[in-house]
Amino acid sequence: MTAPSQVLKIRRPDDWHLHLRDGDMLKTVVPYTSEIYGRAIVMPNLAPPVTTVEAAVAYRQRILDAVPAGHDFTPLMTCYLTDSLDPNELERGFNEAVFTAAKLYPANATTNSSHGVTSIDAIMPVLERMEKIGMPLLVHGEVTHADIDIFDREARFIESVMEPLRQRLTALKVVFEHITTKDAADYVRDGNERLAATITPQHLMFNRNHMLVGGVRPHLYCLPILKRNIHQQALRELVTSGFNRVFLGTDSAPHARHRKESSCGCAGCFNAPTALGSYATVFEEMNALQHFEAFCSVNGPQFYGLPVNDTFIELVREEQQVAESIALTDDTLVPFLAGETVRWSVKQ
């Protein structure tokens, strides 16, 4: 006789860092998020980036048009910060509940970030306005100087950009997104109530050995890049400790297969279909399932000053195999953990 499956019921989660792209890709990937999550912070790094209220409103509508009937999902829009952004435009979007937050990409740090910020001084009037109105700043925390090793970019960002910024604007709410190092985990843990972080499933489950030993695995390649195991362990300990200023942010970032499996492949893991079960696996491995719901469904809304979702979902603990690929116009998408057997999945 087969033992009954273990079921884990939690308040509906939110994804506080998500890439949905646009066009056919958007239509393909939105349902994988909207069937599970109540809300998601949608990244603005389209081409061209989302820098105006009108662009955000139009993008939000394209997202909503792709949400299947029966899914109750709210996209939370963000503004892409540039050196030339008008603070008045940002404040208008925030006051009209179009922009939930603004995103700081250092120029050329990741996909479609060539329009990003060249220096903090260049956007200081914008940041001062954000501090004044209580608008959160979302930060891709890596320096991009050519002489700095890719594995050191996050730690160097803390000392050269993040800490001086927070010393200068002490009331600014900051989310240090997709942190990947012990340095960042310690920095956020030791910070005040105006500093929080998101962490992806891939940075909790894997380290750079998994990506590079025995062959290059392009579908584990993302930015910030996977680090050594001591950093992975620090992240696992932070999220499963019950610390309340770290929350779910998948950084799900879809690219067509041919753009990942190439001589110069794109960075990003399409983890929306498998992320929640992956997080549950980590919490179970760390004997910390009692903190799982807070990480997924409570800590984020608390930091943003939003209500928690009033519906619930269930995860079931039974082995399931992840699809090898997902159909996309003229190509396919390879999901995170493609072809692998996973322990936890969302109950349908």
From Swiss-Prot:
CDD domains named in the record: DHOase (cd01294)
Catalytic activity: (S)-dihydroorotate + H2O = N-carbamoyl-L-aspartate + H(+)
Keywords linked to the UniProt accession: Hydrolase, Metal-binding, Pyrimidine biosynthesis, Zinc
Positions annotated to bind substrate: H19, L20, R21, N45, H140, L223, H255, A267
EC numbers, comma separated: 3.5.2.3
Active site: D251
Residues annotated as binding Zn(2+) 2: K103, H140, H178
Membership in a protein family: Belongs to the metallo-dependent hydrolases superfamily. DHOase family. Class II DHOase subfamily.
Subunit structure comment from the entry: Homodimer.
The protein's name: Dihydroorotase
UniProt source species: Shigella flexneri serotype 5b (strain 8401)
